[in-house]
């Protein structure tokens, strides 16, 4: 993947084929607002900036929900790597993960 720096992707008519030889780019993570792709990452935008541009964020923060796992007897680290280990989550613990 070629390096894409400030200003190199916002050119008029820029497409995924220009840089990656694909039909389109499904997700292009950036740290500044551009409208050249179907979806952008917004890791350092403010809520006010997102609202101004009518962008609805989707958040993923498993480390922020520790209280959901206290009753199950597992640490957050155990739950996060459970897919690669033999830990079996109960239905109640699995439901807590999906809150």
From Swiss-Prot:
- List, alphabetically, the SUPFAM superfamilies matched: NAD(P)-linked oxidoreductase
A Gene Ontology MF term for this entry? glycerol dehydrogenase (NADP+) activity
- Reactions this protein catalyses: glycerol + NADP(+) = D-glyceraldehyde + NADPH + H(+)
Q: What InterPro entries has UniProt attached to this entry?
A: NADP_OxRdtase_dom_sf (IPR036812)
Is the keyword NAD assigned to this protein? Answer: no
Q: What class of enzyme is it?
A: oxidoreductase
Q: What is this protein called?
A: NADP(+)-dependent glycerol dehydrogenase
Organism annotation? Aspergillus niger
């Amino acid at each position: 993947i070629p390096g894409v720096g400030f200003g190199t992707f916002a050119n008029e008519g820029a497409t995924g084929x220009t840089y990656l030889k694909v039909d389109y780019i499904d997700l292009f993570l950036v740290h500044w607002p551009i409208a050249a792709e179907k979806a952008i990452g917004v890791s350092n935008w403010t809520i006010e900036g997102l609202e101004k541009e009518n962008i609805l964020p989707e958040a993923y923060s498993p480390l922020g929900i520790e209280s959901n796992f206290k009753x199950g007897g597992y640490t957050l680290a155990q739950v996060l790597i459970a897919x690669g280990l033999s830990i079996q989550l109960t239905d109640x613990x699995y439901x807590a993960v999906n809150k």
